[in-house]
């Protein structure tokens, strides 16, 4: 339940790099593949929580402390007993679950298709699970956390507000949930991550965000602004972007 170790992250990244070189397709396809590949928010204040932005190669996950999950999204944590932190990532269902990643399957990921969310539960700190250099923390108000969780919940396919595990994930402490939004070359794992942060009220743009680097740059900017504003009472909330 400690999440993907360094060897797993390296193996997944290496496998994806090989796919890109062999297929010469846009790096958007790697978003699906790279699924394989701290302190509690209370420290930030009783009325705030922490959002974790984790970069996993070409893919970015959005996470939070399991204790911060409220109904109905708390059902996701129930599927990962013992997890202290829960991370969500968006992907192309057909590609991610395909037995053979041949040309037709690779190409299909470019066009709108069914999505899936890989949900990972970890028992150690995110910085330990993914590497400190690959995790950005953002302080969120209660309203921001509520809006973020509402966005993630809307992304999940449920039956009568009940969330059911679709199947076990690729490593211990992970499960797949079916998603509602379509995955495509123009709406990738990283587009979804940007939409999640924007839903939480952060000033990020979402249109044209295809690659992890495009979202990572924005998350780093948010972190710098947060650090600068720490003693001034300034806010990172934004009404509009794009």
Positions of the model-derived regions?
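Residue-identity detector for glycine
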Residues: 3, 14, 18, 231-233, ...
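Short, low-complexity intrinsically disordered segments enriched in A/P/G/S/L with frequent Arg
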Residues: 6-10, 17-18, 22-25
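Bacterial N-terminal signal peptides
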Residues: 24-36
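Non-catalytic ligand/cofactor/substrate-binding and regulatory segments of enzyme domains
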Residues: 47-57, 61, 65-178
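Activation targets extended, charge/polar-rich intrinsically disordered C-terminal tails
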Residues: 154-242
């Amino acid at each position: 339940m400690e999440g993907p170790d360094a060897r797993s992250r390296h193996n997944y990244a290496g496998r994806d790099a090989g796919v890109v070189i062999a297929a010469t397709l846009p790096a958007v396809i790697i978003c699906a593949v790279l699924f394989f590949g701290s302190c509690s928010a209370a420290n930030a204040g009783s009325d705030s929580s922490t959002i974790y932005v984790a970069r996993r190669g070409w893919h970015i996950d959005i996470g939070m402390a399991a204790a911060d999950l409220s109904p109905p999204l708390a059902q996701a944590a129930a599927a990962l007993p013992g997890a202290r932190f829960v991370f969500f990532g968006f992907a192309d269902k057909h590609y991610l679950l395909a037995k053979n990643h041949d040309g037709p399957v690779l190409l299909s990921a470019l066009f709108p298709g069914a999505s899936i969310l890989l949900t990972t539960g970890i028992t150690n700190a995110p910085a330990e699970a993914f590497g400190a250099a690959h995790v950005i923390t953002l302080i969120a108000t209660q309203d921001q956390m509520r809006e973020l969780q509402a966005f993630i919940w809307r992304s999940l396919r449920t039956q009568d507000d009940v969330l059911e595990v679709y199947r076990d994930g690729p490593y211990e402490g992970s499960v797949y949930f079916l998603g509602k939004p379509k995955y495509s070359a123009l709406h990738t794992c990283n587009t979804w991550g940007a939409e999640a942060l924007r839903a939480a009220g952060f000033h990020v743009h979402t249109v044209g965000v295809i690659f992890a680097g495009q979202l990572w740059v924005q998350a780093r900017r948010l972190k710098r602004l947060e650090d600068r504003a720490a003693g001034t009472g300034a806010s990172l909330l934004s009404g509009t972007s794009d």
